[in-house]
């Protein structure tokens, strides 16, 4: 069954509905009370384009329309208004025209983690993975910044050493055409490389750990999607019955059971070393980075390190998959990328950051894929911690969830033929005055929000760029690849999520030409 159909099917699932029916009846009066206690408020200053009340979420038609056509709703809204409200799966959201991007991007009254708390239910059992940081703590953000800088120093060599072996295993050495599933193979590569970067020697090769944490992340996102389909007042009940939530609680327990003994053993080892006047060994992994970043502050030592690999696994997998699918229809661009790789001529001991920075065309092609297909259709989502007045006098009330739609990334005033893929686009734009440093993959701007923009821009984007470039170098240099036929790849839109095609197949074959530094 199609992924989107499965999501919508939750609304009428035979597995869930009977168990919830009795409980739903028992709280029906609460819904009526809620409408009395929480009438339309100051939020109604902006028009709502797909409903008039938050409790309209109980209307399946409104919710289904948002899940299947959020972009269409926003496009219609922007044709009429600069600011409007939309009933989303996390409640009412205020959508700002992209022209407001620069005005809000560094505003510290606007908080991202508070939005994450609304989207990912961190206080429900099993959703422990998404809890860190939603309480106002900055341990996670500090750990990501510290860990990313550590990874950049060691990642190029490590990734270079491993990528060739992984591709040989997953794509083979056959000179004849054969088929692979693009996203699943990319997922396996990113999962393995992330484990090497983020987990210590005890866990990076632990089969059960890798399987459980991978499933935990996938089920966590699925469970959150399912819960968002229920009216807010029913979610505390629904989470006990939904199959994905039940599975998530088991996976959370199993994850803790695997990582907590490792943490305990390290703490014991440190205590013994200190008692004998010795310095304990230093582990260069996410467990250690988070502990050092915390500086004595409380945090979830078992779950916080997982967020390094979870973010890398899902967002980087999606980006690299989309890049490969886009390139598979651009044979001339693939040839040009091979020539660029050869011109850089990495040393025999692998790629370095300096050589990766010379791959201007590759950088441009990746950024172009991200421009046309970011991970979400509403970016820079923020929660207003206080009342906010915009420069034009519009007032954003405290408690508003707001966001910027992606349409600015197809602005014809910035981009020529904005709906067309042009792998050379950002390489050429570097020559324009004022754009020299704004067209790199890791650069953020009001007209490219792929990694966000401002104080909440993705702190892991520098490491993600290194990962994608190294893997892509090996794929482009060592393999011919093209779409395997059938229907062209389609982006799946589920609410605000934009998901690269999970089923797209590639025809691949090993090239025989030797590439300097890649053999």
Curated annotation (Swiss-Prot):
CC cofactor: heme
UniProt xrefs under Gene3D superfamilies: Cytochrome P450
GO cellular component, one term: membrane
Binding site for heme: 458
Principal location listed in the UniProt entry: membrane
Function: Cytochrome P450 monooxygenase; part of the gene cluster that mediates the biosynthesis of fumiclavanine C, a fungal ergot alkaloid. DmaW catalyzes the first step of ergot alkaloid biosynthesis by condensing dimethylallyl diphosphate (DMAP) and tryptophan to form 4-dimethylallyl-L-tryptophan. The second step is catalyzed by the methyltransferase easF that methylates 4-dimethylallyl-L-tryptophan in the presence of S-adenosyl-L-methionine, resulting in the formation of 4-dimethylallyl-L-abrine.
Name recorded for this polypeptide: Cytochrome P450 monooxygenase easM
């Amino acid at each position: 069954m199609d992924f989107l159909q499965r999501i919508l099917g939750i609304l009428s699932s035979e597995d869930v509905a009977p168990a919830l029916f009795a409980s739903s009846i028992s709280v029906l009066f609460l819904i009526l009370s809620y409408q009395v206690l929480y009438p339309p408020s100051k939020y109604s200053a902006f028009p709502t384009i797909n409903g008039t009340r938050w409790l309209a979420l109980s209307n399946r038609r409104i919710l289904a329309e948002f899940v299947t056509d959020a972009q269409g709703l926003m496009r219609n809204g922007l044709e009429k208004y600069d600011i409007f409200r939309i009933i989303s799966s996390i409640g009412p959201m205020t959508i700002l025209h992209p022209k407001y991007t620069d005005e809000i991007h560094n505003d510290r009254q606007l908080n991202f983690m508070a939005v994450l708390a609304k989207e990912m239910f961190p206080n429900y059992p099993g959703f422990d993975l998404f809890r860190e940081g939603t309480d106002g703590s900055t341990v996670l953000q500090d750990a990501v910044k510290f860990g990313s800088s550590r990874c950049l120093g060691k990642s190029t060599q490590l990734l270079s050493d491993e990528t060739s072996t992984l591709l040989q295993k997953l794509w083979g050495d056959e000179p004849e055409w054969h088929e692979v599933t693009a996203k699943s193979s990319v997922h396996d590569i990113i999962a393995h490389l992330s484990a090497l970067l983020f987990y210590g020697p005890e866990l990076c090769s632990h089969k059960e750990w890798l399987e459980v944490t991978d499933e935990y992340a996938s089920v966590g996102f699925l469970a959150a999607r399912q819960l968002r389909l229920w009216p807010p007042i029913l979610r505390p009940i629904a989470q006990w019955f939904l199959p994905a939530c039940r599975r998530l609680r088991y996976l959370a327990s199993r994850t803790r059971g695997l990582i907590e003994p490792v943490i305990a053993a390290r703490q014991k080892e440190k205590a013994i070393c200190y008692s004998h006047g010795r310095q304990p060994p230093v582990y260069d992994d996410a467990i250690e980075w988070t502990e050092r970043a915390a500086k004595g502050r409380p945090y979830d030592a078992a779950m916080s390190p997982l967020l390094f690999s979870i973010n890398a696994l899902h967002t980087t997998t999606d980006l690299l998959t989309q890049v490969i699918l886009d390139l598979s229809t651009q044979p001339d661009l693939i040839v040009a990328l091979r020539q660029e790789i050869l011109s850089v001529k990495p040393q025999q001991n692998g790629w370095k950051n300096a050589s990766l920075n010379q791959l201007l065309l590759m950088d441009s092609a990746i950024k172009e894929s991200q421009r046309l297909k970011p991970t979400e259709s509403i970016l820079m989502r923020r929660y207003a911690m206080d009342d906010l007045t915009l420069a034009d006098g519009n007032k954003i009330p405290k408690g508003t969830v707001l966001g910027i739609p992606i349409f600015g990334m197809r602005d014809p005033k910035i981009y020529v033929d904005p709906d067309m893929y042009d792998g050379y686009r950002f390489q050429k734009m570097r020559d324009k005055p004022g754009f020299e440093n704004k067209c790199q993959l890791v650069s953020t701007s009001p007209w490219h929000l792929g990694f966000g923009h401002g104080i909440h821009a993705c702190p892991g984007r520098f490491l993600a760029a290194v990962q994608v470039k190294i893997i892509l170098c090996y794929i482009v240099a060592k393999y011919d690849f093209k779409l395997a036929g059938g229907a062209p790849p389609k982006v799946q839109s589920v609410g605000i999520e934009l998901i690269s095609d999970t089923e797209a197949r590639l025809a691949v074959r090993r090239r025989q030409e030797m590439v300097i530094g890649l053999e």
